[in-house]
Amino acid sequence: MYKKKIARLALCTALCALVTTSVFASPTKAKAKSHPRQPVKAVRQTAKAPAGYTHKQAVHDSATLRIGIREGRGSVAVTGPQGLGVYRGDMLWKKAAANVPVTIALSGTNLTVNGDISTVPVQVRSLVHGGSVKITDGYAYRGALEMMKSPGRWGLTVVNVLPVEQYLYGVVGKEMSPSWSEEALKAQAVAARTYAIAHKSRFSQRGFDLTDDTSSQVYAGINGESPSIIKAVNATKGEIITYQGRP
């Protein structure tokens, strides 16, 4: 935990060097009014960060993360406001109408989906592109929810599989108040993205990349989103901090 705090402190130091100048140093009031975003762009390209740190766009649009959101559960029920599809691999296996629960349970080493056996993990997705899946006793999520037998222990593991940028929508607002300044939220978005990429696959033996709690970054799915957070994440799309070439 101490090492984790030191790493985050170093990352924040680098971000301050790259962002703070854009917040406090406009050449003239007239120029600031006519080109409000120009100082930010210039700082991102030219500001001098601590030795070894680089601010760059390095995360591809197609990059995804696997976030562990449940472990050791006997069963999980999910719903979707636009209906759900249950997939085995790339094959659509079952459908459920809008807001009709789908229950996935563990049966020996297999899964059951509304009572029907599956010998392989399943993914539950909205039937509508951009839709959501909600755990009935928890949060709603973008992307897919993958259900599998928990590796090395009893029970089900539930993994949220989604693009990095959409993951950040549900993270940044749990690390910082959505009411903070736009530049502060952008800096936090870069920090959170950098952390996610640097620690990807940390929990691979448990079937996912990151947890949804303080062991990684607190993640609340769609329930953690707000317009100001989404705006900050989109404005810094793909940007991370590297130290000596590594996140």
Over which residues does each language-model region extend?
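Conserved, single-site charged/polar hotspot
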Residues: 2-247
